[in-house]
């Protein structure tokens, strides 16, 4: 009977438990989010599949993680799973049977992983799988049983892999397959047996492979022709004559095999031994092979793996679980820092595990679970800092354990209790703290003397360096905070160390007086009192820090600058019973500030700026006993303000300016009744109640008469005078603001600051926590910072369009996780750094158009990002580089975003303006948030770029070492003292010293600097060519190749040996000059003969025997007629016309783009092209604000024109005014825009860049438009009957100035070449595409050049300089003329001068007073620096050194006295002057001189010729007596 009862009870319990299991909800894995039957774990950086996935899960998202391995247990039990997303991980291994429980699986995505192979029969249990994506992996082969069991697959994607082998029958079971992608692989051959069982196949991609089109692939051509819609673009890659041919177009006879070839069915078996390793006798040896990960798919029978001395960093889950017979595993001397908890799972035979010499810091829980046979465990030379108490619980047979040389400070009691067979243990070289928690280890080692390495204590100091096994146990004791920090070490929990800048004593953490502005991140959990007083806190943020401090009881925030406490700031502080907020800057108190303080008993709010206590200020603080509001600015307390404080026993309201009007009437009676208030709070207003205790005022005296109706608790908000406020919306638009106005309500949700003068995002915006919209458009903001939008967690809309933004810092938008709309339209942004939008997870719309985006590889991420969910509407276009110009960010393929060489410096300088070196003349550049950059100029220069000299000599105008001197009495003038050998206004002329030279024997004089050189004839030498040479002397004989040298009157001649010619017999005579080589043979010269090198096919001594005749090939361009000046070039053996700018077509026969450079030009299209129902589309680019694009009609007309940069379309049917529509977009940015015009009988539609069309409908009367009139493009003729358009309001009637291309009328591309071409209309769109001429007309001068024809009153290359310069003929004496306007100027005086015209001298310090010149005199340089000008024969800074004797060439007049007349040579004469000193008592003087005749002119008008002695050589000689 009892047995039956127990059975019944067991059955009942089982039934109840079964029901509970089905009803009770299962927990969601940590970090993941669960909704219904969907589990979302994407993008969490997971390294393995999380455990505890609910059994009822139908959809599991694991994409975007770091998972490397899929094991058999990862998805065990998930029998309801239908969708599994595993793309974008690092999966390299999938164990066989990993999907065996997924009976309901329908869709599986494994694309973008690292799979190289996958086991056969992997999908055996997934009978309902119909979509499988394995693309973008590294799969090399498809084995025969790869998809066995997955018979319902309809969509199979294998593209972008490395597949080179597909075994026969691999797809045989996939009879329902509809989509198969094999493109972009390495496939060379295929068997027909692989594809002849797919009757439903509708999409098949095989292009971009290495197909070898020989006889074995002939079946594929017929197969593709029978299915013309599949296998498109499949091409042969070999043999060479078929390369690039479509397989379906190759005839069957062309599929030939050379020689004897037999086709073997491919076998895709993969070697189990890795290529880098050796395998023998069940041992896999991979030592020192540079491996970075554990090799996979090893033989399952191996018993030993040697992986030491590699670079492995991670041991993934189940890395060795397939190898059940493994006995020895060596992983020493790697870089292992991460071990999966189940890394060694299932290795029951393992008896040796070597892990020394790695970077392991912690042993995961259950790491050694189940290793019952382990005898040797080496963990030495790692960085292990803790051991869990159960780390070795299954190691009953362990003999040796080495933990030598790690970072262990303590070991929990019981850690080694399971090691029943332990014989040797190494614990030395660990920094053990020998406190009370390590006492057990000393006792253990006394009882079991197995520690042989000599483990010692590191601290405390009294036990330092003593052996643990030799210390008495009573000396192991705890003091201070040691007990708190290490008492949980058995769970690998050691509490945090004392924070930097703080002091810890017992359970008190003191961080006061440290100028902190936020709470330290790492506070020990044992903290009971936290002191943060006397710091720089302004806002207490909700960081969740108090959730980590379960023991906290008291917090001190006194003497800070706190103005606000965020909601949730104290969340988790449920145990805190005392908070001190004394001496801060709080202005109001709200209950949400103290949310989470359920146990608070004391709240100190003394000495703040609180003006009102509301009736909801202290809701939720029912435990507070003491509340101090002493010394605030409280004037009003709302009725019921203290009703929620049920435990309140002490209330301090003293030292507050209470206004005892009708709003405070309730408080007097409340104070009398409660009797919990400290002292007697007194009235301060009205005057007749001043200093009267509130509780003593009669109820009838609390009145609001005489205008005393102030109530600080009134909900009315303030509004700045510059703004308008409605509820929580504040509008401050178009007010010229440069700073944020004061008085904006704290609860503002929408703030409009557009149309102002802000240059930076106001820092004060971070104080407004409730903002959901900020509009800062149309300001002058040039820079953003990483903190521009901090603390704006609720922001939904941020508008920054039409500013001067050039650069987006990487973390500008961090924290804006709620943002939905971001507008950066109309700025100067070229690059957005990758990761800048990482936190914008809720963003649905990004406006970034009208920016010069530089779309290289660094912007590929942004293109992918906007494409992912169409977050950008297709407006943003690229400005470069190269072919990316004008491409849409949204639709351009990602592969087009490539980097070709270094990025242009102008692009890089947008985020670092100083990179472009804008500061001239060695100025120092500093980045500036408003002006982009600022230059600190060196002495002598000024201006924004330091490019303006302060006076004329600063720029060193005197060349070749000349000295600059400022002129007196002239504006900015200077004069130069030239160095010897130079003359001219700027010392730019090198004097011709050869004009009077002494070169002899017909030698040639070569001018130098203040000297000359004589270039001698071959037979002479010497300084003046005065010595004759013997050329046939042994050391000078120039004759080569044993030829004979013979002296001649003019020099020498060489008598050459046979076979050589030339002046020096140095040329081997070319015997090929008169050769008999035939048929284009190459003649090779030899000594006294030659050899004929025959072309291919020719033979004979002179190549006279010809080969069989072959027909010469002709160039493909010979009969290919390129038009309009185009050049024919050959690409891939095909002729192609390279068109000139503006032309298009196979032979460049059409002109499709023209440039309107003359504002009186237009094109005329015949009327037959335009009917009542017409669609006109064209692309335009211009910088102009106005101009006519299209015009048709007479009095009644259709006109499309530019009006203030927008497109205006008007339809005048005779009514006044004409009907008109305008585009939303402005298009005068220089970029191309698409304009589309659609006319119907009663409507006109205008669309720009594919945007929403603007329409004119329901016209006032039937149109009388003359459709027989022509259509004018780019302008119109100046006839009287179109004057109405020119005079219409807002219209200027001027012709278009810019570029028009791709004009379509009713889908027909128009050829401008067929229209009359006026002057001022040029083919193509460059170089006058941009508005380069400021006040004039651009005229192209070549394909890439241009000239500007200036308007009246302007001049310069770009017509940007006015012709009337007021500084012409100015009267500034010692200064610079500065124009004030077109008619007047002012003088900026040089240093030392003053007055209106800088004509008055001022006292000036003479720098020459500080310098002494021994043999010379002091001069001032052009920049005002003193220097010594030395006398002849002396040098040095002070002219104190005598130079050695040398001849200094001077150029001067010779002078003579003839009676009373002074005479001099008619020109300057060059001569030597001997200067310097000599040693040994000798004198410097002439060694050689000449006499030369010169003409002289005298002061009395006479002239004569006389000889003059000239010195030609100087040196040291005996002094003259």
Swiss-Prot record:
Disruption phenotype: Mice show significant axon guidance errors in a variety of pathways, including corticofugal, callosal and thalamocortical tracts. Mice double-deficient in SLIT1 and SLIT2 show retinal axon guidance defects and a disorganized lateral olfactory tract (LOT). Thought to act as molecular guidance cue in cellular migration, and function appears to be mediated by interaction with roundabout homolog receptors. During neural development involved in axonal navigation at the ventral midline of the neural tube and projection of axons to different regions. SLIT1 and SLIT2 seem to be essential for midline guidance in the forebrain by acting as repulsive signal preventing inappropriate midline crossing by axons projecting from the olfactory bulb. Residues 1152-1325 form the Laminin G-like domain. Residues 26-55, 264-300, 489-525, 710-746 form the LRRNT domain. Residues 1445-1520 form the CTCK domain. It comes from the Eukaryota. Its main location: secreted. One of its GO terms (molecular function) is signaling receptor binding. Disulfide bonds join 277-286, 434-457, 436-478, 498-504, 502-511, 660-683, 662-704, 719-725, 723-732, 855-878, 857-899, 914-925, 919-935, 937-946, 953-964, 958-976, 978-987, 994-1005, 999-1014, 1016-1025, 1032-1045, 1039-1054, 1056-1065, 1072-1083, 1077-1092, 1094-1103, 1117-1128, 1122-1137, 1139-1148, 1299-1325, 1333-1338, 1350-1359, 1367-1377, 1372-1387, 1389-1398, 1408-1418, 1413-1428, 1430-1439, 1445-1484, 1463-1498, 1474-1514, 1478-1516. PANTHER family: SLIT HOMOLOG, SLIT HOMOLOG 2 PROTEIN. Residues 1-25 form the signal peptide. It comes from Mus musculus (Mouse). GO terms for biological process: aortic valve morphogenesis; axon guidance; axonogenesis; cell-cell adhesion; dorsal/ventral axon guidance; in utero embryonic development; kidney development; mammary duct terminal end bud growth. Glycans are attached at residues 66, 186, 556, 615, 786, 791, 1001-1002, 1011, 1175, 1258, 1292. Residues 912-947, 949-988, 990-1026, 1028-1066, 1068-1104, 1113-1149, 1329-1360, 1363-1399, 1404-1440 form the EGF-like domain. This is Slit homolog 2 protein. Expressed in developing eye, in the optic stalk, and in the ventral diencephalon. The lineage of its organism: Eukaryota, Metazoa, Chordata, Craniata, Vertebrata. Residues 209-259, 430-480, 656-706, 851-901 form the LRRCT domain. Keywords: Chemotaxis, Developmental protein, Differentiation, Disulfide bond, EGF-like domain, Glycoprotein, Heparin-binding, Leucine-rich repeat, Neurogenesis, Repeat, Secreted, Signal. Coiled coil: none annotated. It is found in: Secreted.
């Amino acid at each position: 009977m009892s047995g039956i009862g127990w059975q019944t009870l067991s059955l009942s319990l089982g039934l109840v438990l079964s029901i509970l299991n089905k009803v009770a909800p299962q927990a969601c894995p940590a970090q993941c989010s669960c909704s219904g039957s969907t589990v979302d774990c994407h993008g969490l950086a997971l390294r393995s599949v999380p455990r505890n996935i609910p059994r009822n899960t139908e959809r599991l998202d694991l994409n975007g993680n770091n998972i490397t391995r899929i094991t058999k247990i990862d998805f065990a039990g998930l029998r309801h799973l239908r969708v599994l997303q595993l793309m974008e991980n690092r999966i390299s291994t999938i164990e066989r049977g990993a999907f065996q429980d997924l009976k309901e699986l329908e869709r599986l995505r494994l694309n973008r992983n690292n799979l190289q192979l996958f086991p056969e029969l992997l999908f055996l249990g997934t009978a309902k799988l119909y979509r499988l994506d394995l693309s973008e992996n590294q799969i090399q082969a498809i084995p025969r049983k790869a998809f066995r069991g997955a018979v319902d697959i309809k969509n199979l994607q294998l593209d972008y892999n490395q597949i080179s082998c597909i075994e026969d029958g691999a797809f045989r079971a996939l009879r329902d397959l509809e989509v198969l992608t094999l493109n972009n692989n390495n496939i060379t051959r295929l068997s027909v047996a692989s594809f002849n069982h797919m009757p439903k196949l509708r999409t098949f991609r095989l292009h971009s492979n290495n197909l070898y089109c020989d006889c074995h692939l002939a079946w594929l051509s017929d197969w593709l022709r029978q299915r013309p819609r599949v296998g498109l673009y499949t091409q042969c890659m070999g043999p060479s004559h078929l390369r690039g041919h479509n397989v379906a177009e190759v005839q069957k006879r062309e599929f030939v095999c050379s020689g004897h070839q037999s086709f073997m069915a491919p076998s895709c078996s993969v070697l189990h031994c890795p290529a880098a390793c050796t395998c023998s006798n069940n041992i896999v040896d991979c030592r020192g092979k540079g491996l970075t990960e554990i090799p996979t798919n090893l033989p399952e029978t191996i018993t030993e793996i040697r992986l030491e001395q590699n670079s492995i960093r991670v041991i993934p889950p189940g890395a060795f679980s397939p190898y059940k017979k493994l006995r020895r595993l060596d992983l020493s001397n790697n870089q292992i820092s991460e071990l999966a908890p189940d890394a060694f799972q299932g290795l029951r035979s393992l008896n040796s595990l070597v892990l020394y010499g790695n970077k392991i810091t912690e042993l995961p829980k259950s790491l050694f679970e189940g290793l019952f046979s382990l005898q040797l465990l080496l963990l030495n030379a790692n960085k292990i800092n803790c051991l869990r108490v159960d780390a070795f619980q299954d190691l009953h047979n362990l003999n040796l354990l080495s933990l030598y040389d790690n970072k262990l400070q303590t070991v929990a009691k019981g850690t080694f209790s399971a090691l029943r067979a332990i014989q040797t243990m190494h614990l030395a070289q660990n920094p053990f703290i020998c406190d009370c928690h390590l006492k057990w280890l000393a006792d253990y080692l006394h009882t079991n003397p197995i520690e042989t390495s000599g483990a010692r204590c590191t601290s405390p100091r009294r036990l330092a360096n003593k052996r643990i096994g030799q210390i008495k146990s009573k000396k192991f004791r705890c003091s201070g905070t040691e007990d708190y920090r290490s008492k949980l070490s058995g769970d690998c929990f050691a509490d945090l160390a004392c924070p930097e800048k703080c002091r810890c004593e017992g359970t008190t953490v003191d961080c006061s007086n440290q100028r902190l502005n936020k709470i330290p991140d790492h506070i020990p959990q044992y903290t009971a009192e936290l002191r943060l007083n006397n710091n720089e806190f302004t806002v207490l943020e909700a960081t969740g820090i108090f959730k980590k401090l379960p023991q906290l009881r008291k917090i001190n925030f006194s003497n800070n600058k706190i103005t606000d406490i965020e909601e949730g700031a104290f969340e988790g502080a449920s145990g805190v019973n005392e908070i001190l907020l004394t001496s801060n800057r709080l202005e109001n108190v709200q209950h949400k500030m103290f949310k989470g303080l359920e146990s608070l008993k004391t709240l100190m709010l003394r000495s703040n700026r609180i003006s009102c206590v509301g009736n909801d200020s202290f809701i939720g603080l029912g435990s507070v006993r003491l509340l101090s509001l002493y010394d605030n600015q409280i004037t009003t307390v709302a009725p019921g303000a203290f009703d929620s404080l049920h435990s309140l026993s002490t209330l301090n309201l003293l030292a507050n300016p209470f206004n005892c009007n009708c709003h405070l009437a309730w408080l007097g009676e409340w104070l009398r009744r409660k009797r919990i208030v400290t002292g007697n709070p007194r009235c301060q207003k009205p005057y007749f109640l001043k200093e009267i205790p509130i509780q003593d005022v009669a109820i009838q005296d609390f009145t609001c008469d005489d205008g005393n109706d102030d109530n600080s608790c009134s909900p009315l908000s303030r509004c700045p005078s510059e703004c308008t406020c409605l509820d929580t919306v504040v509008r401050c638009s178009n007010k010229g603001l440069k700073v944020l106005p004061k008085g904006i309500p704290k609860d503002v949700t929408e703030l409009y600051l557009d149309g102002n003068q802000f240059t930076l995002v106001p820092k004060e915006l971070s104080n407004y926590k409730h903002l959901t919209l900020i509009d800062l458009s149309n300001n002058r903001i040039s820079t953003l910072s990483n903190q521009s939008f901090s603390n704006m967690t609720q922001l939904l809309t941020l508008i920054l369009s039409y500013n001067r933004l050039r650069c987006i810092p990487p973390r500008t938008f961090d924290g804006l996780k709620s943002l939905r709309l971001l507008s950066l339209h109309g700025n100067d942004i070229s690059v957005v750094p990758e990761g800048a939008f990482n936190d914008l997870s809720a963003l649905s719309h990004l406006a970034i158009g009208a920016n010069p985006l530089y779309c290289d590889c660094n912007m590929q991420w942004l293109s992918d990002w906007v494409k992912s969910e169409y977050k950008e509407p297709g407006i943003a276009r690229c400005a470069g580089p190269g072919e990316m110009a004008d491409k849409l960010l949204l639709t351009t393929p990602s592969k087009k975003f490539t980097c070709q060489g270094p990025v242009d410096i102008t692009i890089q300088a947008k985020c670092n303006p100083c990179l472009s070196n804008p500061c001239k003349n060695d100025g120092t550049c500093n980045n500036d948030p408003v002006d982009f950059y600022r230059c600190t100029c060196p002495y002598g220069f000024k201006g924004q770029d330091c490019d303006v000299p302060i006076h004329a000599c600063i720029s060193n105008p005197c060349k070749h070492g000349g000295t600059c001197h400022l002129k007196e009495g002239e504006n900015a003038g200077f004069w130069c003292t030239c160095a010897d050998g130079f003359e001219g206004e700027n010392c730019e002329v090198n004097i011709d010293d050869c004009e009077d030279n002494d070169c002899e024997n017909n030698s040639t004089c070569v001018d130098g600097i203040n000297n000359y050189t004589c270039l001698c004839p071959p037979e002479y030498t010497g300084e003046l060519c005065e010595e004759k040479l013997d050329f046939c002397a042994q050391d000078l004989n120039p004759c080569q190749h044993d030829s004979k040298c013979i002296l001649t009157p003019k020099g020498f001649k060489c008598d050459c040996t046979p076979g050589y010619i030339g002046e020096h017999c140095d040329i081997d005579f070319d015997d090929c000059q008169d050769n008999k080589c035939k048929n284009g043979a190459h003649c090779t010269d030899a000594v006294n003969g030659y050899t004929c090198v025959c072309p291919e096919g020719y033979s004979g001594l002179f190549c006279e025997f010809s080969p069989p005749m072959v027909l010469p090939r002709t160039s493909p361009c010979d009969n290919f007629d390129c038009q309009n000046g185009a050049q024919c070039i050959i690409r891939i053996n095909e002729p192609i016309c390279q068109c000139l700018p503006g032309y298009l077509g196979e032979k460049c026969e059409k002109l499709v783009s023209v440039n309107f450079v003359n504002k009186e030009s237009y094109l005329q299209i015949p009327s037959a092209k335009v009917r009542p129902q017409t669609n006109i589309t064209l692309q335009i680019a211009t910088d102009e604000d106005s101009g006519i694009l299209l015009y048709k009609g007479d009095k009644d007309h259709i006109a499309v024109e530019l009006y203030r940069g927008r497109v205006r379309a008007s339809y005048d049917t005779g009514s006044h005014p004409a009907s008109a529509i305008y585009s939303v977009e402005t298009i005068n940015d220089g970029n191309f825009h698409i304009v589309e015009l659609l006319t119907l009988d009663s409507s006109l539609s205008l669309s720009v860049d594919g945007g929403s069309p603007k329409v004119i409908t329901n016209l006032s009367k039937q149109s009388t438009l003359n459709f027989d009139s022509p259509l004018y493009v780019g302008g119109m003729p100046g006839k009287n009957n179109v004057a109405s358009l020119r005079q219409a309001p807002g219209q200027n009637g001027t012709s278009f100035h810019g570029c028009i291309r791709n004009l379509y009328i009713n889908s027909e591309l128009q050829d401008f070449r067929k229209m009359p071409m006026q002057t001022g209309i040029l083919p193509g769109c460059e170089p006058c595409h941009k508005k380069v001429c400021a006040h004039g007309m651009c005229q192209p001068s070549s394909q890439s050049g241009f000239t500007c024809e200036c308007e009246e009153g302007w001049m310069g290359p770009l017509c940007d300089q006015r012709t009337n310069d007021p500084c012409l003929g100015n009267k500034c004496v010692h200064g610079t003329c500065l124009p004030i306007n077109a008619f007047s100027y002012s003088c900026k005086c040089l240093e030392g001068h003053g007055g209106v015209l800088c004509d008055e001298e001022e006292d000036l310090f003479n720098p020459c007073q500080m310098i002494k010149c021994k043999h010379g005199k002091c001069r001032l340089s052009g920049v005002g620096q003193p220097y010594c000008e030395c006398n002849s024969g002396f040098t040095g800074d002070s002219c104190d050194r005598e130079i050695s004797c040398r001849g200094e060439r001077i150029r001067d007049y010779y002078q003579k006295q003839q009676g009373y007349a002074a005479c001099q040579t008619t020109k300057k004469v060059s001569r030597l002057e001997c200067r310097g000193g000599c040693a040994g008592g000798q004198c410097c003087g002439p060694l050689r001189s000449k006499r030369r005749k010169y003409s002289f002119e005298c002061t009395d008008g006479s002239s004569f010729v006389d000889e003059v002695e000239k010195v030609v050589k100087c040196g040291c000689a005996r002094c003259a007596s």
